[in-house]
């Protein structure tokens, strides 16, 4: 199987890419870094080398500005939003225009879709919540519409913050906890979905 992936160098994407290769699948890395890219793209400029996607079996779209790298200034919130929504619109439109499109499009989303639910239990049928991340996630999912209309099977992957000591949020806060300087993460009671690579 030939699988194209955006965000292949991120926390989730690098693990998914490695797993797919171990299973014998071919992975096509879609990246803004020409040195790493099998297929180059620049979503902020609406550019993608679409010919490199002809004949793929599946598309996994995980790219987007990290929500935990910087303070959420107005500019950073715009980057978080546009990197997800505009990037997804570009991927979906490109897939819908291919002569030989994939049958499956797995597109990133987030558990932020549900907003702050406190200790309430939620599942994929739960309604959209309120707040910035809920709006981002809802628009992110809507951005796949052109691919759905073209007949691709679209699945939205609503993931939480992945806890990995080698990258992401945990890598940043772990040294503080090891020094005894850690504290509560968020207000209580609160559920935090924390996927790991085995899920």
Residue map of PLM features:
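NAD(P)H-binding glycine-rich loop region in Rossmannoid oxidoreductase-like domains
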Residues: 35-36, 40-90
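Conserved glycine-rich Rossmann-like NAD(P)H-binding loop of the short-chain dehydrogenase/reductase
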Residues: 25-32
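Active-site Tyr-X1-5-Lys
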Residues: 130-154
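SDR active-site strand-loop-helix element
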Residues: 6, 30, 59-63, 105-111, ...
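N-terminal Rossmann NAD(P)H-binding glycine-rich loop of SDR-like oxidoreductase domains
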Residues: 3-23
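Glycine-rich NAD(P)-binding loop of the Rossmann-fold in SDR/ketoreductase-type enzymes
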Residues: 79-87, 128-131, 135, 139, ...
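Conserved Rossmann-fold NAD(P)-dependent oxidoreductase catalytic core, especially the SDR/UDP-sugar
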Residues: 89-131
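NAD(P)-dependent short-chain dehydrogenase/reductase
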Residues: 148-150, 155, 160-196
């Amino acid at each position: 199987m030939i699988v194209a992936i955006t965000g292949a160098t991120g926390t989730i994407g690098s693990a998914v890419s490695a797993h797919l290769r171990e299973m014998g699948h071919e992975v096509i890395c879609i990246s803004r870094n020409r040195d790493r890219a099998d297929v180059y793209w620049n979503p902020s400029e609406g550019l993608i080398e679409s010919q490199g996607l002809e004949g793929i079996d599946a598309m996994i779209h995980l790219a987007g500005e990290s929500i935990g790298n910087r303070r959420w200034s107005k500019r950073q919130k715009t980057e978080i939003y546009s990197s997800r929504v505009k990037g997804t619109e570009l991927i979906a439109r490109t897939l819908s225009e291919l002569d030989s499109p994939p049958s499956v499009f797995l597109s990133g989303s987030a558990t932020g879709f549900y907003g702050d639910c406190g200790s309430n239990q939620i599942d994929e049928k739960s309604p959209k919540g309120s707040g910035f991340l809920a709006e981002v996630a809802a628009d992110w999912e809507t951005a796949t519409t052109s691919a759905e209309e073209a007949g691709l099977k679209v699945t939205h992957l609503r993931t939480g913050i992945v806890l990995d000591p080698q990258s992401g949020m945990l890598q940043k806060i772990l040294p503080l906890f090891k020094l005894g300087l850690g504290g509560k993460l968020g207000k209580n009671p609160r559920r935090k979905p924390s996927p790991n690579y085995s899920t």
